[in-house]
Amino acid sequence: MFIPQISTEVLAIKRPIRIGIIGGGQLGKMIAQEAKRMSIEIIILDPSENCPASSVSDEIILADFKDESAIRKLARNSDVITYEIELANSNALKILESQQYPVFPSPETLGIIQNKFRQKSFLRENNIAVPEFDRVKSIESLRSLCTAYGLPAMLKACEDSYDGRGNLLITSKNKIPQSFEFFHGKECMLEKFIPFVREISIMVARNSDGQIVSFPVAENIHNKNILDMTIVPARISKNVSIKAKKIAEKTIGSLKGAGIFGIEMFVTKDEHIIVNEIAPRPHNSGHYSIEACSVSQFEQHIRAVLDLPLSKPQLFAPAVMVNILGPENHNGTYKIKGLRELLSIPRVKLHIYGKKISKPRRKLGHITVTGNNVQEAILRANRARRMIKVVME
């Protein structure tokens, strides 16, 4: 069995290098778009033939993210495997890695991160500050933890959750029974609520040589647990920014494997920094980097998984990213109106993901706006978002 050796000469081989990606959503699409610029071929594994990445990939394997035989096929047809979704089958990927197939980030890292209780336990063991947490074993243990942590407290499904869909804030004791039933018997954990003054994130990349580089600190504003706006640079002190980068790089240094990682953190009023979650892939809060940085998070991910030199990101201008979400009460086909008006605004870039169906609060695209300063970019972004409307067909 021939396993290609990925090196700095990888782009000069006789045929194009092939990256296999588990997941064909918007992240896979944007990885593929950067890959095409470098003459790299992309093979997608996704259950939907009309997934966003299908329009820019060279081949698509139609299968569930956890399908072992499909993952093996992806490995046979690719030079390196990565993933854009935590739902990938980490056990199947561990087997491939043991057979010398290049899989990045490490399946061991994926296995740690895709279970939130396991992830938080790992971080705590590595002396990285996280909220107090514990596993919920029964309604009695939930009541006990709510008493210990105080309310509000955050109940989280440990697996198969994303975009806040696995989170539920418990605000009073009389809501404990319905909160316990909310996840229908799934493995859950309770976290002590952190009264933060800022939510921030940092994209950090590492290659197989151990080189680590960080992007600027981003400030995130959420609405109903889904990212609404990202502001770069974050409106925090220089001291907090330096501390956040050190913590983010320490976090990634404790994990195995190459790639790009998103580290979400809370900043408290006394400027303590607490790690919330890690994403072992490109992240929504890093989309601004396409227009606002010298290297995007997607190109950096490609560099990392191919063990190419990483580029130190430089921020060209303050930037704001806002998501375009599906309407609350609509499932089905849709149109996006207001594009002409939107594109009349200076320094606005529009990204439409090409999803065929809208679902409540589903990410359908995003807008990135740059400005001479943060406040100008925020005002311009708010003006731009008012012009966009997603309507049902």
Go through the PLM ranges and name each one.
Residues M1-Q114, R118, E125, E140:
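ATP-binding N-terminal substructure of ATP-dependent carboxylate-amine bond-forming enzymes
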Residues K243-I263, K269, A279-N331:
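Active-site "cap" helix and flanking loop/linker of ATP-utilizing ligase/carboxylase catalytic domains
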Residues P107-L168, K173:
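A conserved helix-loop-beta module that forms one wall/lid of the active-site cleft
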Residues S7, R15, R303-E393:
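Peripheral (often C-terminal) accessory segments that flank ATP-dependent C-N-forming ligase machineries
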Residues K192, H287-I290, I367-T370:
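Short, well-ordered beta-strand elements within core beta-sheets of diverse protein domains
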Residues G166-D270:
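Internal nucleotide-binding/catalytic subdomain
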